[in-house]
C-alpha cells in the first residue's frame, strides 16, 4: 500500500460565499457612506406633517373672480312704454306670398292691440315667441275688412296696406288663426272697436 493510500479522507465543506465589503470599508478610503434607509419613525413624522398641511388647507375654498369689464345696466325700450294694451290674444300669423302663390308662416305669439296715449291711435303689434321679433306692426285702419278664411271658423284674412314689421311700410295680405272660434270672434269684435277709435283719433 502506497503512502498516498494511507492519507485520511477529509470531507470538503462547501465554502461560504464571501460577503460584500461593508460601507465602513469604503469610508476608510474616502468613499461615501451608504445612506441609512428611512426609519419607521421618519415615515410617521412625514405622515404627521402631511396631515397637518391637510388640516391647514380649507376644505371648500371660496373662489371669487373679479369681472374684467364692468357692464352698466341698460334699460331696453320696446316702444310700448307710451301705449295702453286694449286687447291681447295668442295667435299664429301667415302672409300670402304672391310669387309662390302660397301662405307662409310669419310667426306665433301674443297679438296685442296698443293704444297710443298721445295720438290715441290703435295698432296691432305681434311678436314671435322666444325671439320676440316683430312679425306684425300696423295701424288698424278703418278701411281694413276681416274676411272669413275658407275652411276655418277660427281664422280671418285681411289686406294691410302699410305693415312696418320689417322696418319699411309694405303691403301684405295676412291670415291670422286662433286656438278657438271664441277667440276668433272676440278678435273681430275688438278689431272693429279699434277701427272706431282710429276714426275719431
Curated annotation (Swiss-Prot):
CDD domains: RanBD_RanBP1 (cd13179). Residues 1-17, 32-66 have a biased composition (Basic and acidic residues). The modification Phosphoserine is found at residue 60. GO terms for molecular function: GTPase activator activity; small GTPase binding. PROSITE patterns: RANBD1. Residues 1-66 are annotated as: Disordered. SUPFAM superfamilies: PH domain-like. Interacts with GSP1 and PRP20. This is Ran-specific GTPase-activating protein 1. It comes from Saccharomyces cerevisiae (strain ATCC 204508 / S288c).
